[in-house]
């Protein structure tokens, strides 16, 4: 049976989707409203949290505590691990006080999420802390819908690949039939575009950025993607085969 409320002294990770507040799940909204503490991640170079902006209309600041915590992603591994440990310590302390804690994260908590580092810390050092997750709509699905591009039909293969991989591994993924989704293209766009052009796939590729947020763009021609279009929240969809049904 699905839980009807958050029990005292637990952590729930809520996926808030790609950016559009209307893509929040009903369950996510309900559990958000029941939380004593809402924790939102932000980057080390940002003063704001996109995840918080998505859910803030469902939070009551007079009743709920909102904590914004930095999740460093481009610092030395030791510094990043120290930050995750510190946040895990804080959450464990809140849970031990009987607080109902909700951690909000973009997309889905189990899909390339900042939350995963935190959960690993909690499970290894605080196994007594009850942890659960509420799925969110991934940017992959939202982008496919926005671009009207099917991710899989019949026996198609769907590959989801970080574009930060070395060239040989990216090339292997691009040689697979079906659809390839390239994530994290912000800092590797030119390299990815070149690989797609070499394989004659650039015209089958669609660039999508900032879904559901200000500055959203869907660009079906990679040659028209300019440097100012690149954003941390961007991906590329590549469909190798077209079915006629």
Please describe what each predicted stretch is.
Residues 1-21, 26-28, 33-130, 193, ...:
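Class I S-adenosyl-L-methionine
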Residues 2, 27-29, 92, 148, ...:
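A generic local secondary-structure boundary/capping motif
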Residues 11, 174-245:
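A contiguous loop/helix-start segment that scaffolds small-molecule binding in enzyme catalytic cores
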Residues 40, 67-70, 133, 153, ...:
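Structural signal for conserved beta-strand scaffold positions within catalytic alpha/beta enzyme cores
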Residues 47, 51, 139, 188:
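Short phosphate-engaging motifs
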Residues 83-93, 149-162, 224-235:
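A polyampholytic, Gly/Pro-enriched intrinsically disordered region
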Residues 88, 164-167, 189:
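Structural motif corresponding to alpha-helix initiation and N-cap regions
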Residues 107, 111-176, 227, 240-242:
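Class I SAM-dependent methyltransferase SAM-binding "motif I" and its flanking Rossmann-like core
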